[in-house]
Structures are given as structure tokens and as C-alpha cells.
């Protein structure tokens, strides 16, 4: 499976974990994850830099996949923070490489995005599917309607 397809498959799988509900209260906010605001600028930057890595045959647009990746990375971080768990950059980089996403390292914006998303893989590795899905779904997420339906 190509790196593009792995990223797309991972994002779609994680997007199915739970439905993002509600609306973000500010046009400059892509989502509110727990008490953390995810800036729309971070999604826009990631779309600009990382769309080239997304499989164009996907059922979701590159913007939807990338927005989901950015937001799910924040959701995973919220779960890790609640546990007091730390995941170093080196550990995140190992997860990225192990899951076939190292090509994203060629662009700093994409590298930052996928490093954040590595927290999702870490939770699945650490807890197993059922617990990780439950923990990720339990996080309160309000998405900006500009990002489409969730």
C-alpha cells in the first residue's frame, strides 16, 4: 500500500471512530477540541502543503482528509494530556516511519501534522482498538462548518 493510501486509510478509519459534532464559534477556529482551539490557519497551511500526498481517488476531498488529520491529532493529544502521558518527538517519528508516512517529512508543515497524528496510532497501539476508539470518541469536538459535514 502506498504512503498516500495508508494516510488516507488511517484518516478515514479514525474519522469513523466518532462523529465530530457541534460548530466552532469562530471563523478563525477550525475546531475546538476539549478546551483547545485548532486554528483554521493550521488546517489551511496543511492543505496547501500536504494535498499533494493525498490519493485523489479517495471518497473524501484532500481538504477533508487533512482537516480530519489535524483535528484527530489534537483529539489524541487531549487524551494523552488527560492521562499525563508524554510522547516525545523521537517516538512520534518512529510511529510515523513504522506506519509508512515518512514521505510527509519532506515538508515541515506536513511533518508537523503527521507527527501530531502519530498520537492516534500510539493510542491504538497502547490501548487496543476498542479502548482507543472509546477514548477518542469521548473528547468534546466542535468543528467549523466550513470544513464540511462530519
Regions found by a protein language model. Give the residues of each.
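Bacterial N-terminal signal peptides that target proteins for export
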Residues: 1-11
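Bulky hydrophobic/aromatic packing residues
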Residues: 8, 51, 145-146
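Hydrophobic alpha-helical targeting segments used for export or membrane insertion
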Residues: 12-16
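C-terminal motif of bacterial Sec signal peptides marking the signal peptidase cleavage site
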Residues: 18-22
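N-terminal targeting/tethering segments
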Residues: 25-114
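PPIase-associated folding chaperone regions across multiple families
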Residues: 33-34, 96-150
